């Protein structure tokens, strides 16, 4: 299977340049927990993930929130600056801070961010799709520290059904059923078709051994009626950002 991605610049890169694992934890105690996956949609650290991964079991926003970003062979721990979420769809849009965490200190460092083009074209039933996410990730205690093993995994499948009104209590907005194997931790990862993002991993059902995987994703077009925070509590619509070329959506 293809192991590289084409980014906004048309460059072929390792997928972990544009897709990242999400953590929560404490930088002082160095105790972290792996949560899910996210992916970049603009060069400044704007990203998308699934809405449900941004909240804990008590329906409170995850705090603190960290992203492990890889850029040009180096790894950075970046904090969340802010995020917004769709009122119905399982989508959240966030911005990472340009301050990284290094040896328990906060350092402002400009980081080049490779990001995806988004597709406005609705896929068809039986279209082949794939995802790259971090379900096989672990954080292992090692004395006074922890060692993170973040292993990105490709999965592919086909689109099997479209539900314009959602599937029920969990997915109340338009969604697609697929045969992509979505494991725990892959929520929030990108669904790709012909090199562009068409959706976000949302949920999956456990199947018996040998059965075809059953999973669902939210179409990326659901972000078009959202607005995001820009600067100091200013807001712009996603459509405005697209028209300004700050999000590539075609």
Predicted segments, located by residue:
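Cysteine/selenocysteine-centered motifs that mediate thiol-based redox chemistry or coordinate metal-sulfur cofactors
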Residues: 83-86, 227-250
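Catalytic-histidine neighborhood of serine endopeptidases
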Residues: 31-35, 42-89, 99
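N-terminal activation segment of mature serine protease catalytic domains
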Residues: 1-37, 47-50, 89-92
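Short, well-ordered loop/turn sites that connect or cap secondary structure elements
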Residues: 41-42, 123, 192
């Amino acid at each position: 299977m293809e192991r590289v991605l084409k980014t906004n610049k048309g460059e072929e890169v390792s997928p972990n340049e544009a897709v990242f694992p999400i953590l929560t934890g404490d930088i002082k105690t160095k105790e972290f927990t792996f949560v899910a996956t996210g992916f970049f949609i603009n060069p400044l650290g704007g990203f998308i993930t699934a809405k449900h991964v941004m909240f804990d079991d008590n329906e409170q926003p995850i705090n603190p929130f960290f992203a492990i970003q890889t850029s040009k062979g180096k790894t950075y721990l970046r904090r969340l600056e802010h995020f917004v979420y769709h009122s119905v769809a399982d989508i959240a849009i966030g911005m990472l801070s340009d301050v990284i965490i290094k040896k328990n200190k906060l350092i402002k460092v400009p980081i080049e961010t490779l990001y995806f083009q988004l597709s406005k074209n609705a896929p068809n039933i039986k279209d082949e799709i794939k995802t790259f996410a971090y379900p096989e990730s672990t954080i292992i205690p090692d004395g006074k520290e922890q060692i993170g093993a973040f292993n990105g995994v490709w999965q592919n499948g086909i689109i099997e059904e479209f539900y314009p009104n959602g599937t029920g209590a969990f997915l109340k907005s338009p969604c697609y059923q697929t045969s992509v194997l979505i494991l725990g931790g892959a929520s929030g990862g990108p669904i790709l078709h012909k090199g562009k993002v068409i959706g976000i991993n949302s949920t999956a059902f456990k199947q018996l051994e040998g059965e075809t995987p059953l999973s669902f994703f939210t179409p990326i077009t659901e972000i078009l009626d959202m607005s995001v925070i820009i600067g100091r509590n200013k807001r712009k619509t996603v459509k405005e950002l697209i028209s300004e070329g700050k999000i590539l959506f075609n």
